[in-house]
Amino acid sequence: MAHPTASAWKIIPQFQSLSINRTLQFYTTELGFQTGGVHPENNSNPTFCSLFTGPKAEANIYFRLCEAGDFHAGSAWIALGTAELDAFYEKVKGEGRVTIVEELEDKAWGYRQFAVKDDDGNVLTFFKFLEGGNPGTD
């Protein structure tokens, strides 16, 4: 019998945020994410939010409010479809409102990738596999 953790089907990273409202604005406006939830609801100063993108919210990130002295930036990787990776990079670069910390490049380890930084310093690396297996046209 397989170990019980072999049934895992999703991972949700949790980042810290110095302003949930600013985080919501950045991820929805600049990166195209959708809001999954905010806590407390109907509050002008939320302490938590869930943001997602992709089918069935497959790329989901939680953000918790953190005091500046306790803040530590995080990072996560998000796989995109074959055609969408380059198109998204061109969109982000062309608009010039998002800090690109790593330009789009094919890597020796078999990924084509680029990375962006949010307003708090959290880094998202968007990638696709060079050998195929990505959704979309290879």
Enumerate the predicted regions with their spans:
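Vicinal oxygen chelate
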Residues: 19-20, 78-123
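Conserved short beta-strand elements that form part of the metal-binding/catalytic scaffold
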Residues: 34-75, 123-128
